Amino acid sequence: MVGRLEGMNDAIDEFPGLKARTLRFTCGAPRSARAIGDGSRALFLRSDGPEDTVTSLWMSVIGSDGDTDEILLADPRTLLADADAEDVPAEEKARRERAREGGSGIVGYSVDAAGNRVAFTINGQLFLTDIAAGVTRGIAIDEPEFKPVLNPRISPDGRHIMYTTGTYLVDVDLADVSDTTDAAEDAGDAVSIVASVPQDDADDVADTQDGTQDDAQSDAAESQAGEWKIGLAEFAAGEEMDRYDGFWWSPDSKYVLFETFDASHEQTWYIADPADPTKPAQARRYPQAMTANADVHLTLLELGYDTDGCYYGGIAHNVEWDRESYEYLAAVSWTEGHEPLLLVQDRLQQHDQVLAVHVGEPIVTMSAPENGFTDEDGSEVETFSIAIPEYAPGEEPGTTRVLEEHSNDCWLDLIAGTPAYTPDGRLVCAMNDMDADTNRLTVDGTPFTPKGLQVREVLDVTDNDVLCVVQRTPELLPAADLPFLWQSNADDHDARSFDVVSIRYDGDWEPLTYVPGQWTMSRAGDGCVVTGRGMDDAAMQMQHCMNVRTTDGDGDGVDAADMMSMVVSPIENHAETPGFMPNVRFVRLGERALYAAVI
């Protein structure tokens, strides 16, 4: 007993240093999982050990026979010699701070709709992984005006990568980048500026319609230094609303919605680097309470690509809403086959509007340029022009219409993943139901989630159900009304537990996580990835699950739908543990009986 106590005391003494070296015990743990394709594959990030901060890109695979494997897709140390000596742009550092990202290497990724290509950066350099070919190659961005590479997003069709420099929105045509080498490939003519920050306002941010970039570059050069940004989320969105993106591809890869904002009215703070006192303090715009916020604009950019998939020009349409009354752009959603959705809020966050952005069907579509012809004298004439799309009156893109409005005299909670369309066109929104004392979901304005099941995040929306993270309020949803799988530990499924459930539009629901804890999920096809931890274990858990067909005792294939079995593949976790288990007791305190933990 004495030796055990001494060991625990040693672990407690070592805890502060160990927590710092392991980035709060996250190094070596799998994270950022996403199920792709038919669900038999799942991407995730993980470093090699408990004190290794350099994160690699991995893929979990479940075969048709139920065999499982973990495949290393991209190792920063293999791709970049100085991967350990992280050197990322200042704007990227700021974005990571808002996202509470402390790792290095590959800290985020973007995958196309089919799950075949993945884009990411390492130390500000752009890379592309072709999963089927098993090749990862660097895309060298050499021109200074095309740097830094921030927040790259691959198009849903996998043919383009869009990123922002903060000053320019840049397109990379992957058709012009070689598929035959894993060495760094010079992007060359594959890179085009498609939009830039404006000089005085946000009315003219698109690239010139004749395909040149002179005006865009000129506007950016003359803009106020650092006041206007393009393709980035403003501080309030990232820090307070958990919105970190500043541009969004359309599902058909033909459009991009992008944000521009003017931060010149915000206060300037000067942030020093405590790790390097020789560096001068950096100026950062910060929206202090009771002072002006950034002035946020949104633009719909119609993209023109030729038959080879190469960008030749774009047409910009201002997205119009009452920006004076609703200054916060809280969320953007774009479902295949439907118009993009916006959620905008007023300054006090007591009123919001759900808006549909009109994209429009042109009566004359944009066409590829005619590049050069011969005049009457037989002389070659250099030209470059594109056909500008024409729209019927009232069909011009960029106008918005209000689909729903919500009000709450106290506060409107933001529910991540809302608003969203179902594939068949029904509108799913969040609702602060004060009468039911519940954060609920509505479909076409009608609440359908149960009273007492507090919706915290929407993970996926289908025609049949909504996948979401919930907390239960026992006073509103008693144990007797819970599904069978929660009956044995009903008391622990309360405000302390973030559970994943499937809720159908008729109100029926079923839990998909059974152990009380903090959970999330990504699903695709017949597969999913569950990530989280229970209350009785400090270790992060990740499981890749997939329904596969089984065979009968003779080995013959069985086609019946009821002969499917669930394969559960645990993803390895190399993270450190604290070395001791704190003695925690939960109590209810105060007039409102709030949950508290006594350690």
Model-derived features with residue positions:
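Beta-strand-rich domains and repeat architectures in extracellular enzymes and scaffolds
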Residues: 18-58, 105-114, 328-332
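Residue-level detector of Asp-centered blade-edge/turn motifs that repeat once per structural unit
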Residues: 37-38, 113-114, 156-157, 251-252, ...
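Non-catalytic accessory segments flanking enzyme active sites
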Residues: 32, 54-55, 107-108, 257-260, ...
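Structural motif
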Residues: 51-58, 125-127, 167-173, 265-271, ...
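Predominantly five- to eight-bladed beta-propeller fold
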Residues: 3, 60-108, 177-210, 214-247, ...
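Hydrophobic beta-strand positions that form the internal "hydrophobic ladder"
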Residues: 42-43, 118, 158-161, 253-256, ...
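Short loop/turn segments that connect beta-strands within beta-propeller blades
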Residues: 62-65, 130-134, 174-177, 303-306, ...
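Beta-propeller domains
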Residues: 259-456
